[in-house]
């Protein structure tokens, strides 16, 4: 069986950029037994932090993005990734990719081992109550097989559940798209 031809990404993007739609904005370019390669466009419309058991590789092809993470010390940290830059996110790092309008990146993820679920997490943005300490409001676990189809219903459920966005520690009700600063 012959190998598939290489993908001309600039050409693909010029013909398919309309496929990169919120809330996540991703489109699977390649999927193998071990890896998934996605094009991801902005703007996205997410307020979650994604937790996964594997590393994640970011290459920012067009424009800049901001990767919000919770670092090893349990503190919020912003990592700007500029056009042309690459970044390898360590496994088990909660992260929230903030993609701006007219931006495109490539993301490479490992296939998740069976029994190693991903999680979507939302943290309270009320700094008056919590300072810089991430305070979990909600967490949803799932066995990731296809981010393109699995994230949207989880995000939509968050958006449509105002009572579920209330912090049990301070009572603050988070906006549907509100991220901790």
Curated annotation (Swiss-Prot):
The keyword Secreted does not apply. It comes from the Eukaryota. Keywords: Cytoplasm, Dioxygenase, Iron, Metal-binding, Oxidoreductase, Pyridine nucleotide biosynthesis. Belongs to the 3-HAO family. It comes from Mycosarcoma maydis (Corn smut fungus). It holds the Pfam family 3-HAO. Fe cation binds at residues 50, 56, 95. The keyword Metal-binding applies. Catalyzes the oxidative ring opening of 3-hydroxyanthranilate to 2-amino-3-carboxymuconate semialdehyde, which spontaneously cyclizes to quinolinate. One of its GO terms (biological process) is L-tryptophan catabolic process. One of its GO terms (molecular function) is 3-hydroxyanthranilate 3,4-dioxygenase activity. Its cofactor is Fe(2+). This is 3-hydroxyanthranilate 3,4-dioxygenase. Its main location: cytoplasm. Pathway: Cofactor biosynthesis; NAD(+) biosynthesis; quinolinate from L-kynurenine: step 3/3. O2 binds at residue 46. It catalyses: 3-hydroxyanthranilate + O2 = (2Z,4Z)-2-amino-3-carboxymuconate 6-semialdehyde. One of its GO terms (cellular component) is cytoplasm. Substrate binds at residues 56, 99, 109. The lineage of its organism: Eukaryota, Fungi, Dikarya, Basidiomycota, Ustilaginomycotina. Its EC number is 1.13.11.6. It is found in: Cytoplasm.
């Amino acid at each position: 069986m012959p190998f598939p031809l290489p993908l001309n990404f600039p050409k693909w993007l010029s013909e398919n950029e309309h496929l990169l739609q919120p809330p996540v904005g991703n489109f699977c370019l390649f999927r193998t037994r071990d890896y998934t390669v996605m094009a991801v466009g902005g703007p996205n419309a997410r307020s979650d932090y994604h937790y996964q058991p594997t590393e994640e590789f970011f290459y920012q092809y067009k424009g800049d993005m901001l990767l919000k993470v919770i670092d090893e010390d349990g503190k919020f940290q912003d990592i700007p990734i500029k056009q042309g830059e690459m970044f390898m996110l360590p496994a088990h790092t909660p992260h929230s990719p903030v993609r701006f309008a007219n931006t495109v990146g490539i993301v490479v993820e490992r296939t998740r081992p069976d029994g190693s679920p991903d999680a979507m997490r939302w943290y309270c943005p009320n700094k008056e109550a919590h300072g810089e300490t991430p305070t979990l409001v909600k967490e949803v676990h799932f066995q990731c097989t296809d981010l393109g189809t699995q994230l949207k219903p989880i995000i939509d459920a968050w958006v449509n559940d105002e009572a579920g966005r209330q912090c049990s520690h301070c009572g603050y009700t988070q906006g549907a798209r509100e991220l901790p600063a």
